[in-house]
């Protein structure tokens, strides 16, 4: 499973967006059914930013669904269809 840990980037908005964009494109093209993004638990602000980023129309076209892991709220699972 592909994974992106955002802990080292949490203070720089531009780096976070770039890392997310590159990661989603890489995961989309990899053929993996699921990829994980780890914003951590913290205050939930980073997780909200990640979900808002994933909800943008141009990003939404790349995956089927995204969800907060029900067993670990510090992790977001992004599901891709195998087209």
Regions found by a protein language model. Give the residues of each.
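Long, charged, low-complexity intrinsically disordered regions
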Residues: 1-83
């Amino acid at each position: 499973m592909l994974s992106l840990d955002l802990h080292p980037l949490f203070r720089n908005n531009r780096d976070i967006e770039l890392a997310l964009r590159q990661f989603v494109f890489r995961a989309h093209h990899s053929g993996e059914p699921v990829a994980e993004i780890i914003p951590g638990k913290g205050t939930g602000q980073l997780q909200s930013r990640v979900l808002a980023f994933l909800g943008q129309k141009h990003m939404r076209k790349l995956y089927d669904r995204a969800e907060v892991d029900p067993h670990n709220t510090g992790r977001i699972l992004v599901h891709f269809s195998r087209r």
